Amino acid sequence: MQTSHYAAEKDMQDAAPRLTFTLRDEERLMMKIGVFVPIGNNGWLISTHAPQYMPTFELNKAIVQKAEHYHFDFALSMIKLRGFGGKTEFWDHNLESFTLMAGLAAVTSRIQIYATAATLTLPPAIVARMAATIDSISGGRFGVNLVTGWQKPEYEQMGIWPGDDYFSRRYDYLTEYVQVLRDLWGSGKSDFKGDFFTMDDCRVSPQPSVPMKVICAGQSDAGMAFSARYADFNFCFGKGVNTPTAFAPTAARMKQAAEQTGRDVGSYVLFMVIADETDDAARAKWEHYKAGADEEALSWLTEQSQKDTRSGTDTNVRQMADPTSAVNINMGTLVGSYASVARMLDEVANVPGAEGVLLTFDDFLSGIETFGERIQPLMLCRAHLPALTQEVA
């Protein structure tokens, strides 16, 4: 079974176009890099063979400080309120996003910090005030990722699931939510009246010191339409294993949606990096992780993905549950030597509409260090960076 799956991945890799670059491409290829911090246990590998660890502030502090040392542009944390179970208890143990990122804002100085708001759990006026507070802590380096919520048990357990019709109305809800945020961040006052929210001389002060960035991760048509109108950039999943440009149609859809609103909303693409000295050594690690897939946790994810029957077939959760590479929730996976991974990331940068990547690693601390020391120096799209100091991250 593993042999046939490997062959399928090789076919995908061989079919992917290989791009060549010239010096004149270098400026156009400048691409931002972020780290998707492991706010939940075990990061993004649903495998008994992957590193097993609990999320702590100290771990995430070490990760983000190391990322800042290696000139990463931003750090993002998700929010997860209930996990997948299984042998690995995958994502059963999670920190909270805003409080974690407030702490990380206080121990960093340059890197942009993003927290995720589960908008069903927090009124927009509270998020507006929390964001303004972290803006003050960070010196203007904070932004907010807005999510509508797809995993019904996260909200049912608290008695706040609004009913299954929410699946088809969630971006209507989010549209009102962000309008309240923009009112409060812009003028400090909101009298917004809508179907979901009613503000009556609602006040928030002080306002953020800089315009607050809002990001989203919409891949459905409704999600992209929302991002086109309100987001500063939009996250999307990479696709496949060693097929770095396979997400290009998604980026093109986002670009087209943004053009219809007269805005520029770039795509930031999610990838996992599994690197080693040679392609074969990296591939061996990937095969080892797949062999230990936590089938019980993966079955739970598949079950949850089938509960939303109203949002279409192009949602994030349906890609996460696809059996092709479910062991890491089907984010794009780059497996190879340091040079191979650098080349593939340069290919990502050459896709129209792609402005950045959000990276995860099989082992975050060693992975970020290896990326900073061995991969990033080989990337054309990061050639603009200053030389590293000799300080240990």
Curated annotation (Swiss-Prot):
Protein name: Pyrimidine monooxygenase RutA
Family: Belongs to the NtaA/SnaA/DszA monooxygenase family. RutA subfamily.
tRNA-binding recorded as keyword: no
Induction comment: Up-regulated by the nitrogen regulatory protein C (NtrC also called GlnG) and repressed by RutR.
Reported function: The FMN-N(5)-oxide reacts spontaneously with NADH to produce FMN. Requires the flavin reductase RutF to regenerate FMN in vivo.
Keyword NADP: yes
Catalytic activities: uracil + FMNH2 + NADH + O2 = (Z)-3-ureidoacrylate + FMN + NAD(+) + H2O + H(+); thymine + FMNH2 + NADH + O2 = (Z)-2-methylureidoacrylate + FMN + NAD(+) + H2O + H(+)
SUPFAM superfamilies in the cross-refs: Bacterial luciferase-like
Any Pfam family the entry gives: Bac_luciferase
Gene: rutA
Superkingdom assignment: Bacteria
EC nos: 1.14.99.46
MF (Gene Ontology): alkanesulfonate monooxygenase activity; uracil oxygenase activity
Keyword terms of this UniProt record: Flavoprotein, FMN, Monooxygenase, NADP, Oxidoreductase
GO biological process, one term: alkanesulfonate catabolic process
Positions with a binding annotation for FMN: 79-80, 145, 154, 170-171, 220
EC top class named in words: oxidoreductase
